[in-house]
């Protein structure tokens, strides 16, 4: 009879990552309800882990294809901030290694702030290279948001020390002399694009939280410049700030 306590068995199961581990057989016939519950929880955890690994590998298929076809440096690209009434559009290019294995990397919109912050630090640390480019509100007003996004993306690529052999871009085709694959919802289909989306969002969110101190009353730390009720109330009360986009409605109504 297994003399381990249920707590000891649970702790041991937390260290096991393989269903063929011999220890599982030693506790399989333990009739204690707590042990059987712990085994079921372990099996569910491993099933979720396997599902996450398969999803990760599926999101790495574009990078693997281009590596296998002679490309060395593949840059995933994404942007954050095309829709807000205030603040910049931020773009990012990320080049990853083939051994990159942060399974949690996915579309930044599906992650909590805590998850994004942790992944941001890991991506910046583990990526071959990360490049960020920004266009502020005056440039957006001058060029239009789509052109300003393309411009920032191209600058992000040109700032890379390693010239990419191929680009994987989320939705926005670029006028640049590098072969590229454009994916709709690319941050859900490519690990490199997802990594770029996380870095771009964390970078922009940090900027907007700083702007919240400079321009209080609009809720920038919470709404990141999007047109929430609090933001619109701030515009009504105080007018537009220098970081508001004059070409985005309803901002022109609140220009002094």
UniProtKB/Swiss-Prot annotation:
| CC terms in the record's Gene Ontology section | cytoplasm; ribonuclease H2 complex
Q: Which Pfam families match?
A: RNase_HII (PF01351)
Q: Which cofactor does it need?
A: Mn(2+); Mg(2+)
Asked whether the UniProt record includes DNA-binding among its keywords, one would answer: no
- Top-level class of the enzyme under EC nomenclature: hydrolase
Keywords, alphabetical: Cytoplasm, Endonuclease, Hydrolase, Manganese, Metal-binding, Nuclease
Q: What is its EC number?
A: 3.1.26.4
Q: Which reaction does it catalyse?
A: Endonucleolytic cleavage to 5'-phosphomonoester
Cofactor comment in the record?
A: Manganese or magnesium. Binds 1 divalent metal ion per monomer in the absence of substrate. May bind a second metal ion after substrate binding.
Q: Which residues bind a divalent metal cation?
A: 78-79, 170
PROSITE patterns annotated for this entry? RNASE_H_2 (PS51975)
Where in the cell does this protein reside? Cytoplasm
Q: Ranges for the RNase H type-2 domain?
A: 72-256
* GO terms of biological process kind: DNA replication, removal of RNA primer; mismatch repair
Is Nuclease one of the keywords UniProt gives this record? yes
GO terms, molecular function: manganese ion binding; RNA binding; RNA-DNA hybrid ribonuclease activity
Q: Where does the UniProt entry say this protein principally localizes? A: cytoplasm
Q: Which parts form a coiled-coil structure per UniProt?
A: none
InterPro entries xrefs:
RNase_HII, RNase_HII/HIII, RNase_HII/HIII_dom, RNaseH-like_sf, RNaseH_sf
| Leader sequence segment | none
What the protein does?
Answer: Endonuclease that specifically degrades the RNA of RNA-DNA hybrids.
User: Which PANTHER family does its entry note?
Assistant: RIBONUCLEASE H2 SUBUNIT A, RIBONUCLEASE HII
The UniProt similarity line reads:
Belongs to the RNase HII family.
Protein name, as recorded: Ribonuclease HII
- Native source organism of the sequence: Limosilactobacillus reuteri (strain DSM 20016)
């Amino acid at each position: 009879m297994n003399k381990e306590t249920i707590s000891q068995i649970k702790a041991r199961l937390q260290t096991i990552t393989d269903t063929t581990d011999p220890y599982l057989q030693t506790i399989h016939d333990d009739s204690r309800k707590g042990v059987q519950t712990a085994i079921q929880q372990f099996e569910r955890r491993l099933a979720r882990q396997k599902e996450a690994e398969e999803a990760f590998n599926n999101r790495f298929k574009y990078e693997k294809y281009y590596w296998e076809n002679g490309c060395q440096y593949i840059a995933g690209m994404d942007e954050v901030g095309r829709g807000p009434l205030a603040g910049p559009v931020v773009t990012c290019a990320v080049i990853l290694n083939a051994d990159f294995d942060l399974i949690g990397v996915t579309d930044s919109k599906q992650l909590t702030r805590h998850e994004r912050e942790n992944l941001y630090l890991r991506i910046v640390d583990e990526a071959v290279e990360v490049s960020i480019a920004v266009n502020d509100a005056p440039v957006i007003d001058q060029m239009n948001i789509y052109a300003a996004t393309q411009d920032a993306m191209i600058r992000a690529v040109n700032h890379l020390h390693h010239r990419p052999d191929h680009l994987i871009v989320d939705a926005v085709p670029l006028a640049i002399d590098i072969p590229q694959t454009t994916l709709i919802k690319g941050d859900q289909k490519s690990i490199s694009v997802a990594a770029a989306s996380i870095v771009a969002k964390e970078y922009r969110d940090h900027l907007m939280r700083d702007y919240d101190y400079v321009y209080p009353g609009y809720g920038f730390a919470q709404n990141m410049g999007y047109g929430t009720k609090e933001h619109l109330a701030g515009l009504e009360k105080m007018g537009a700030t220098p970081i508001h986009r004059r070409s985005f409605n309803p901002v022109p109504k609140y220009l002094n």
